[in-house]
Amino acid sequence: MKDTKKTQSHIETLDAKDGYALIDSGNGEKLEQYGSYVLARPDPQALWQKRLHQKGWAKADATFVRVGAQAKWHKKKDFPTMWTMALYNLYFEIRTTSFKHTGIFPEHVSMWMWMEDKIQNRIAKKKKAPVVLNLFGYTGGATLACARAGAEVCHVDASKTAIDWARRNAELSGLSDKPIRWILDDARAFLKREVKRGKKYDALVMDPPAFGNAGKGAVWKIEEHFTELLDLAHKVLSDDPL
């Protein structure tokens, strides 16, 4: 007898007042609105067919193109090196980087919402701000969401460029006065010192890359270092985490 149950999908969309919109995707690419500009970028997970005709895709202000080992953005005249946009009532500096990234991951918004809810519930219950550690903090989306909700946040990244970018985003979002510690360091090295100090955190946020700079000439490789990272993270987690 055939199973008549229909497979249900859960699709999340951002509020229309936000500056981001996924316009179309397919054939290994995605077309996105980032504030005032439309970007076309590769996305290997977009295995389906595009819905828009090529004319729609041709309206992109910048397109990330790979030719062999070379990759670069093809930009229309007067395309800016930087602009700002709103996302989840936070403000971000957007740039087209050499790795096709823009400085934010809009798909993380649902997690920011969940984090804020957890933090606000904890504050309502215990009348005390939880302490959150954000490792591989990048440009600070999760850091800003947690700080806005009332948490004390320690933001760690091995890239000075990312740290500076995150701090500018905090300024743009009006959160410069929030209790955020900005730490330029390798995640594992930082955790080892925190373990020795006996420091504890009520929540940990981690979005490690597969491969990256770990500072001081070291290299991060997720297949080699992730298990150690999790072990260290467990040691700094408080007895009453969020």
Give, region by region, the residue ranges found by the protein language model.
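Conserved class I S-adenosyl-L-methionine
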Residues: 127-138
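Short, Gly/Pro- and small/polar-rich lid/capping loops
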Residues: 3-21
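Conserved SAM-binding loop of SAM-dependent methyltransferases across substrates and taxa
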Residues: 139-153
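Conserved alpha-helix/loop element of class I SAM-dependent methyltransferases that forms part
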Residues: 106-127
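S-adenosylmethionine
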Residues: 187-242
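Conserved acidic residues
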Residues: 36, 130, 202
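S-adenosyl-L-methionine
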Residues: 159-205
